[in-house]
């Protein structure tokens, strides 16, 4: 028996199944890189290998996680697919207190009350940034003024739900090239198109246009459970010529505002990740 298998036995994590993992995720939620639809996509479309584990207490399943390709907790492929690897939020009951037998340096700080053997100063040298419950009145006023100025200059807004996968792929690649030029590589076009096509239902948010031409697009993915909704901005791009109109700030504000309304209507907790805080 391998050492890792012994650790899982000692910490009460049992071998599980994808079906059970999906059920636990639907109840407790987690980060996008732990979402069962994402797992299913990489299992079926890319033949990736996953091992699932669950934690049972008082005849109830209180948590579950997986190991991807015998390497990591979570799906960490941010350079080739639009998936953030900034943090791992594992589906767990709020009252669960346990030891996690597998290592990760991306564990969400939200797990501090739950996972007893994590050394947080080592586990998270850089913290992921989650938006506040509400913006200040000054911030809201500034964004509203920017938005009105944007509209007066010929700006418009369109939901990503109203765009085809091919449209989204073309828009993002064009804006990415405008923003970064040759200084940074975009995702492979085939990967992006296939990902958008198969997981279109997880996309959330808006695209901004100036006089009918796309000028800002953040890839926001939504992970919803019975308890919460986790939104993650995996990447974003803007048209350089439009920077004076602050399209990036406006788009982020619109997407967060829409996410807040979405959660309030469903009486669920909002978790909106915008990435690692820079030191």
Show the residue positions of the predicted features.
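Conserved GNAT acetyl-CoA-binding A-motif
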Residues: 98, 259-276
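A conserved beta-strand-loop-helix scaffold within acyl/acetyltransferase catalytic domains
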Residues: 2-59, 66-72, 133-243
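Generic recognition of stable, solvent-exposed alpha-helical segments in well-folded globular domains
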Residues: 145, 167, 247-250, 254, ...
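Acyl-donor-binding surface of acyltransferase catalytic domains
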Residues: 60-62, 67-160
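Short regulatory "switch" loops immediately downstream of catalytic or recognition motifs
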Residues: 222-223, 255-263
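Short, surface-exposed, polar/charged, turn-prone segments marking secondary-structure boundaries
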Residues: 82, 185-188, 259-263
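Conserved acetyl-CoA-binding loop-helix of GNAT-fold acetyltransferases
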Residues: 94-97, 244-259
């Amino acid at each position: 028996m391998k050492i890792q298998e012994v650790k899982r036995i000692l910490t009460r994590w049992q071998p599980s199944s994808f079906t059970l993992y999906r059920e636990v995720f639907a109840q407790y939620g987690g980060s996008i890189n732990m979402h069962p639809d994402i797992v299913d996509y990489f299992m079926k479309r890319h033949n990736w290998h996953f091992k699932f584990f669950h934690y049972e207490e008082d005849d109830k399943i209180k948590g579950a996680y997986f190991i991807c390709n015998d390497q990591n907790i979570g799906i960490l492929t941010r350079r080739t697919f639009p998936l953030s690897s900034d943090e791992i939020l594992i589906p767990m009951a709020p009252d669960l207190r346990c030891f996690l037998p597998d290592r990760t340096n991306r564990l969400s700080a939200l797990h501090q009350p739950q996972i007893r053997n994590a050394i947080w100063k080592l586990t998270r040298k850089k913290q992921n940034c989650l938006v506040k419950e509400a913006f200040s009145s000054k911030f809201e006023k500034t964004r509203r003024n920017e938005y009105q100025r944007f509209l007066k200059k010929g700006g418009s807004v369109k939901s990503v739900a109203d765009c085809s996968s091919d449209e989204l792929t073309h828009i993002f690649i064009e804006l990415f090239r405008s923003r970064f030029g040759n200084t940074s590589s975009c995702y492979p076009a085939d990967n992006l198109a296939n990902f958008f096509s198969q997981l279109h239902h997880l996309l959330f948010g808006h695209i901004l246009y100036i006089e009918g031409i796309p000028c800002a697009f953040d890839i926001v993915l939504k992970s919803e459970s019975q308890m919460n909704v986790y939104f993650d901005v995996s990447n974003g791009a803007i048209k350089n010529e439009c920077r004076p109109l602050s399209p990036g700030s406006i788009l982020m504000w619109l997407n967060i505002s829409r996410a807040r309304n979405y959660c309030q209507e469903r009486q669920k907790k909002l978790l909106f990740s915008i990435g690692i805080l820079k030191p």
